[in-house]
Curated annotation (Swiss-Prot):
Catalyzes the transport of the major hydrophobic bile salts, such as taurine and glycine-conjugated cholic acid across the canalicular membrane of hepatocytes in an ATP-dependent manner, therefore participates in hepatic bile acid homeostasis and consequently to lipid homeostasis through regulation of biliary lipid secretion in a bile salts dependent manner. Transports taurine-conjugated bile salts more rapidly than glycine-conjugated bile salts. Residues 16-37 are annotated as: Disordered. The keyword NAD does not apply. This is Bile salt export pump. Belongs to the ABC transporter superfamily. ABCB family. Multidrug resistance exporter (TC 3.A.1.201) subfamily. Changing residue 982 to R: In PFIC2; impairs taurocholate transport activity; significantly reduces protein expression; decreases cell surface protein expression; loss of ell membrane localization. Changing residue 855 to R: In ethinylestradiol/gestodene-induced cholestasis; loss of transport capacity for taurocholate. It is found in: Apical cell membrane; Recycling endosome membrane; Endosome; Cell membrane. GO terms for molecular function: ABC-type bile acid transporter activity; ABC-type xenobiotic transporter activity; ATP binding; ATP hydrolysis activity; bile acid transmembrane transporter activity; canalicular bile acid transmembrane transporter activity. Residues 84-147, 237-240, 341-353, 777-794, 1001-1011 are extracellular. It catalyses: cholate(in) + ATP + H2O = cholate(out) + ADP + phosphate + H(+); taurocholate(in) + ATP + H2O = taurocholate(out) + ADP + phosphate + H(+); glycocholate(in) + ATP + H2O = glycocholate(out) + ADP + phosphate + H(+); glycochenodeoxycholate(in) + ATP + H2O = glycochenodeoxycholate(out) + ADP + phosphate + H(+). SUPFAM superfamilies: ABC transporter transmembrane region, P-loop containing nucleoside triphosphate hydrolases.
Length: 1321
């Protein structure tokens, strides 16, 4: 029956299989997309596509906000109607006064007449008089201004508030969609997209889209309305003059468009460079122990800086273009003034078509239109930047995953037996299409049996497991479960049937209980406890202060390998899976734990299909069927005995391994007494008794970061990720006081020459506004001069001055733009570099702190440095500009009427109050915003960095829910911010109109009662109010300024921190003849963040130069901790670590580490070539290729590398993802060999290797150990038997030491471990 199902399934899907080459299609898709990107690098997201996530509520908010922005935009041109009429009233009044001062003239019956009886020809031009009461006229105009002020207050508030709220809602949705889409992507997509880049896009790029669709939209609508209404009013009042003025508008438009296009292009390049820098930072911070051990800090800073240099270049180019075209636009505007007043005055004086008031109305309305067009350019910049950022975001959102893990499609079988079959499967990884991993693989895995896959590293064993989980689809052939092609099955359902335990298990930064519950959402606490007992994890968990509520730290990195492995096994067992995949699952366990786990596996085997990839014979022998792999093909199949008889691949592996186990020779076993043999049977036979036997004080302190809080109540209900994070008092970013500007400026000292030049330009630009007010009032004053020739002469002089101002502006605006772009980019680069350098210089304990997780640190690097520009970049130009503006305006105003100046100055406190409120409020929000997004960054980083584990246990939805809950915090903050920012903006806008209202009212009084000339009223009011507007504009930058001070404070806090162990500290002892003698003298140690748990409890052991010391003991007894003390990742609390008789605390850190090489159990490789990874072993000099090849040959790596298409130039992928574990381990060994260290540390260095590789690498390591002091940590006894000293550890102390023979003769803990696998206690 089963066979017919298989045949039917093959026939059905075989027809489709010809074209069902998923990964080929993936590669073609990828290639074509890369070609498209090359062809159309300029392709951008359409503007309205930015709003694709808007709901009907958002559309309503944006509509009302736009309507209010439109009404607000009408207000400015509307005021000009009042202003023009008021100008005519002033001029008429002044003309009347001047005429009445002529001897012989008087006002009779509201007409100016000659008082003598002889009629004169001039009487025909008699002027009306006595009708103007200037004070009552001014009261009327003041009330108009006040009414407009109220309207502006209401509309200004609504436009900003509604648009910011609508944007916050859309951005929240966008972040959710983006993360959801990423979590749906197939694993092959992650092979081609780095996690660091995705994190940068999630934080930085979406923020840029937010900037484009929030308040900038409201301001753009307002300004464009003012532009259009201004031009319409100009045409309505006088088309001739309007046409002349707007004849230069196309040039202004060209300038604005050039700014938009250039900024978009340069921003895109800048973003790409920063994203690459983000990838480097993420990779390095995640691998900090490796970087520190190999002294790679300087090299990594240089690698990071290279990417920053590219970003800096594009930023400076952007500043040059911005500066030049801003100057160009201003130059055109001043030339416009000159042309308008020159031509307009002829229409007033010669042709009498316009009144002076009409001229002012036309001129100002068109200029207001043009100025608003100019002011809209920053909005265009934000839109262009947002569209550039949206390109990659929307591309990802729109991409359909080839294997969609959340798809509802596919069959869900009622029953599953667990029969798995590979039919002619050929496969290569999407990122390395030229390397074939599986080659026509055919194999059957029977249900309810344990099948072991054996073979050399890189033969395709782990790849086969990934195909079963459907991380990838075969390029050819198919994989079936119970006769069904797995491509026809529902993915989530399929993965729910599978439990997976990997060699390098990933735990999530939550509690142990929650990590186990990840296996099954509805698991009760009893289920969790039972699973922990089955995985032999219960005892060490109960020894921890918070037991199951213990937080495991980032990636579970605070636990020993064995502890992590057992929690991962518990997580797999709690699923009760029909198919259990064990990829080197017990390699990190000691003999005792492995025996326990094997017993559990044999118990659950009935009704479960177990596939085990393993190198240990003890694991393989227990299997019902063993399949031998070679070159991506299954070459043999059978039981242990059958395959030994066949003398093929398996026989070779067994022979090699048994040769290595000479320690366990017959003599040793014979020496074991009958009691010992009984104990062995007893400990293996009775599970409960063996559990009791294994109760001991394990090292609780491998968890070097645990938060102190009362234990959670144990509950039997579904606990979500978010609740767990909320209940645990995980420390948030500590509060920092905003950095003082003086400190920021002091830090910016190298950029001062540029800032000085930029400030000179900004100061000159600042004088332009009050000088404009002076010249403008001068022109208005000329219209009341009786002599027309005098009028003409003065107007021409003023027009020439406008031309001169335009030319100066062109130069100074360019100067300001370029100089501050240069200083800002240099500062940002330096801040990023110094910040990154300071991070790499911190002690390892600092990275153990949850607040300094890789996600949080990379997010901080990505956003903080660029925000500091807000306090030291173009913002200084804005401050200098505003200061000069106000100073010159005050001088002009007080020179002509100190009384009126004082009245207007009464409104300055309100302006200052508005700005101060904005600054204070937004400083708070900037801080809270950052904290919330850092927490979001931690979730995304954790999910994406461990995507294989997340996909394997089918917890994509759980991370999505966690992220969506966390996103509520920045959303709520944004809503609060919208209301405050809206009110402050509206208040700052309306205060101008109120100031005008009061000023003109009082000005009327001064003209009427004190004889002040009306042009002085215009001069004083224009100068002060325009300078106040500039001040208001400076205040509008308070959000970025506030964020800048908070970000700068974080940087300074980091730069000021003096780590207790600093790699940058040049002090400390160094000596020439480094021998490698090591003495641990009564070392006591607790991890800094967990002072309640003692890890080492008086460790004392000595190693002479050239000797090998092997540490033996149960998982978590402090073996790896001793290595970390030797590397000076930490210092002992009491006692000493002596190196050649020198106290390690007094030895120079760099010098010490340069003499130590390390190979860890989970090797960390960097996303660069194999050659560069090997060269990383010695960062003090350039390593010649000969040395690289020699090291590779010693590590048995050279032949494998030469079989790759790109040989030593082959990129290993993110975290070495393109290589098998054995291959990665051999690269790590070659890296240690190339270092040529005096001390070699091997922490489970061969646990990841198959038997064949282990044998060859062991030979290499034996060679590498010659002439070197060596410390070995291993669970395989064959690895340690030849050590000069074997130190048996328990509870942080050495309980026995000696050679293998001496310890066997003592018949103590070591003897018991070798003969029975019993626990060390």
């Amino acid at each position: 029956m089963s066979d017919s199902v298989i045949l039917r399934s093959i026939k059905k899907f075989g027809e489709e299989n010809d074209g069902f080459e998923s990964d080929k299609s993936y590669n073609n898709d990828k290639k074509s997309r890369l070609q498209d990107e090359k062809k159309g690098d300029g392709v951008r997201v359409g503007f309205f596509q930015l709003f694709r996530f808007s709901s009907s509520t958002d559309i309503w908010l944006m509509f009302v906000g736009s309507l209010c922005a439109f009404l607000h935009g009408i207000a400015q041109p509307g005021v000009l109607l009042i202003f023009g009429t008021m100008t005519d009233v002033f001029i008429d009044y002044d003309v009347e006064l001047q005429e009445l001062q002529i001897p012989g003239k008087a006002c009779v019956n509201n007409t100016i007449v000659w008082t003598n009886s002889s009629l004169n020809q001039n009487m025909t031009n008699g002027t009306r008089c006595g009708l103007l009461n200037i004070e009552s006229e001014m009261i009327k105009f003041a009330s108009y201004y006040a009414g407009i002020a109220v309207a502006v207050l209401i509309t200004g508030y609504i436009q900003i508030c509604f648009w910011v709220i609508a944007a916050a809602r859309q951005i929240q949705k966008m972040r959710k969609f983006y993360f959801r889409r990423i979590m749906r992507m197939e694993i092959g997509w992650f092979d081609c997209n780095s996690v660091g880049e995705l994190n940068t896009r999630f934080s930085d790029d979406i923020n840029k889209i937010n900037d484009a669709i929030a308040d900038q939209m409201a301001l753009f609508i307002q300004r464009m309305t003012s532009t259009i209404c201004g031009f319409l009013l100009g045409f309505f009042r006088g088309w001739k003059l309007t046409l002349v003025i707007i004849s230069v508008s196309p040039l202004i438009g060209i300038g604005a468009a050039t700014i938009g296009l250039s900024v978009s292009k340069f921003t895109d390049y800048e973003l790409k460079a920063y994203a690459k820098a983000g990838v480097v930072a993420d990779e390095v911070i995640s691998s900090m122990r490796t970087v520190a051990a190999f002294g790679g800090e300087k090299r990594e800073v240089e690698r990071y800086e290279k990417n920053l240099v590219f970003a800096q270049r594009w930023g400076i180019r952007k500043g040059i273009v911005m500066g030049f075209f801003t100057g160009f636009v201003w130059c055109l505007i001043f030339l416009c003034y000159a042309l308008a007043f020159w031509y307009g005055s002829t229409l007033v004086l010669d042709e009498g078509e316009y009144t002076p008031g009409t001229l002012v109305q036309i001129f100002l309305s068109v200029i207001v239109g043009a100025l608003n067009l100019g002011n809209a350019s920053p909005c265009l910049e934000a839109f262009a930047t947002g569209r550039a950022a949206a390109t990659s975001i929307f591309e990802t959102i729109d991409r359909k995953p080839i294997i969609d893990c959340m798809s509802e499609d596919g069959y869900k079988l009622d029953r599953i037996k667990g029969e798995i079959e590979f039919h002619n499967v050929t496969f290569h990884y999407p990122s390395r299409p030229e390397v074939k991993i599986l080659n026509d693989l055919n194999m059957v895995i029977k249900p309810g049996e344990m099948t072991a896959l054996v073979g050399p590293s890189g033969a395709g064993k782990s790849t086969a497991l990934q195909l079963i989980q459907r991380f990838y689809d075969p390029c050819e052939g198919m994989v079936t479960v119970d006769g069904h092609d797995i491509r026809s099955l529902n993915i989530q359902w399929l993965r729910d049937q599978i439990g997976i335990v990997e060699q390098e298990p990933v735990l999530f930064s939550t509690t142990i209980a929650e990590n186990i519950r990840y296996g099954r959402e509805d698991a009760t606490m009893e289920d969790i406890v039972q699973a922990a007992k089955e995985a032999n994890a219960y005892n060490f968990i109960m020894d921890l202060p918070q037991q199951f509520d213990t937080l495991v730290g980032e990636g579970g990195g605070q636990m020993s390998g064995g502890q992590k492995q057992r929690v991962a096994i518990a997580r797999a067992l709690i699923r009760n899976p029909k198919i259990l995949l064990l990829d080197m699952a017990t390699s990190a366990l000691d003999n005792e734990s492995e025996a326990m786990v094997q017993e559990v596996l044999s118990k659950i085997q009935h009704g479960h299909t177990i596939i085990s990839v393993a190198h240990r014979l003890s694991t393989v022998r227990a299997a019902d069927t063993i399949i031998g792999f070679e070159h991506g093909t299954a070459v043999e199949r059978g039981t242990h005995e059958e395959l030994l008889e066949r003398k093929g691949v398996y026989f070779t592996l067994v022979t090699l391994q048994s040769q290595g186990n000479q320690a366990l020779n017959e003599e040793d076993i014979k020496d074991a007494t009958e009691d010992d043999m009984l104990a062995r049977t007893f400990s293996r036979g009775s599970y409960q008794d063996s559990l009791r036997a294994s109760i001991r004080q394990r090292s609780k302190s491998q968890l070097s970061y645990l938060v102190h809080e009362p234990p959670l109540a144990v509950v039997d209900h579904k606990s979500t990720y978010e609740e767990d994070r909320k209940d645990k008092d995980i420390p948030v970013q500590e509060e920092v006081e905003p950095a003082p500007v003086r400190r920021i400026l002091k830090f910016s000292a190298p950029e001062w020459p540029y800032m000085l030049v930029g400030s000179v330009g900004a100061a000159v630009n600042g004088t332009v506004t009050p000088l404009y007010a002076f010249l403008f009032s001068q022109i208005l004053g000329t219209f009341s001069i009786p002599d027309k020739e005098e009028q003409r002469s003065q107007i021409n002089g003023v027009c020439l001055l406008f031309v001169a101002m335009g030319c100066v502006s062109l130069f100074t605006q360019f100067l300001q733009g370029y100089a501050f772009a240069k200083s800002g980019e240099l500062l940002t680069k330096r801040l990023r570099k110094f910040g990154f350098r300071a991070m790499l210089g911190q002690d390892i304990a600092w990275f153990d702190d949850l607040r300094n997780s890789p996600g949080a640190l990379t997010t901080r690097l990505a956003t903080d440095a660029s925000q500091v520009q807000g306090a030291a970049g173009s913002q200084i130009g804005m401050i200098v500009n505003s200061f000069t503006n106000v100073t010159v305006a005050m001088i002009i105003a007080f020179s002509f009427s100190w009384k009126l100046s004082l009245v207007i100055l009464c409104f300055f406190p309100f302006l200052a109050l508005s700005g101060a409120t904005q600054t204070r409020m937004l400083t708070g929000f900037a801080s809270r915003d950052k904290q919330a997004l850092e927490m979001v960054g931690q979730i995304t980083n954790e999910a994406l960095s461990n995507i294989r584990t997340v996909a394997g246990i089918g917890k994509e939805r759980r991370f999505i829910e966690a992220l969506e809950t966390e996103l509520e915090k920045p959303f709520k903050t944004a809503i609060q911010k919208a209301n405050i920012y809206g009110f402050c903006f509206a208040f700052a806008q309306c205060i101008m109109f109120i100031a005008n209202s009061a000023s003109y009212r009082y000005g009327g009084y001064l003209i009427s009662n004190e004889g002040l000339h009306f042009s002085y009223v215009f001069r004083v009011i224009s100068a002060v109010v325009l300078s106040a507007t500039a001040l208001g504009r400076a205040f509008s930058y308070t959000p970025s300024y506030a964020k800048a001070k908070i970000s700068a404070a974080r940087f300074f806090q980091l730069l000021d921190r003096q780590p207790p162990i600093s790699v940058y500290n040049t002090a400390g002892e160094k000596w020439d003849n480094f021998q490698g003698k090591i003495d641990f003298v009564d070392c006591k140690f607790t991890y800094p963040s967990r002072p309640d748990s003692q890890v080492l409890n008086g460790l004392s052991v000595s190693i002479s130069p050239g000797q090998t010391l092997a540490f033996v003991g149960s998982s978590g007894c402090g073996k790896s901790t001793s290595i970390q003390l030797l590397e000076r990742f930490y210092d002992p609390d009491q006692g000493k670590v002596m190196i050649d008789g020198h106290d390690s605390k007094k030895v120079n850190v760099q010098f010490l580490r340069s003499n130590i090489g390390i190979v860890s159990q989970e090797p960390v490789l960097f996303a660069c070539s194999i050659m560069d990874n090997i060269k990383y072993g010695d960062n003090t000099k350039e390593i010649p290729m000969e040395r690289v090849i020699a090291a590779a040959k010693q590590a048995q790596l050279h032949d494998f590398v030469m079989s790759l298409p790109e040989k030593y130039e082959t990129n290993v992928g993110s975290q070495g993802s393109q290589l098998s574990r054995g291959e990665k381990q051999r690269i790590a060994i070659a890296r240690a060999i190339v270092r040529d260290p005096k001390i070699l540390l091997l922490d489970e260095a061969t646990s990841a290797l198959d038997t064949e590789s282990e044998k060859t690498v062991q030979v290499a390591l034996d060679k590498a150990r010659e002439g070197r002091t060596c410390i070995v940590i291993a669970h395989r006894l064959s690895t340690i038997q030849n050590a000069d000293i074997i130190a048996v550890m328990a509870q942080g102390v050495v309980i026995e030491k000696g050679t293998h023979e001496e310890l066997m003769a003592q018949k103590g803990a070591y003897y018991k471990l070798v003969t029975t696998g019993s626990p060390i206690s």
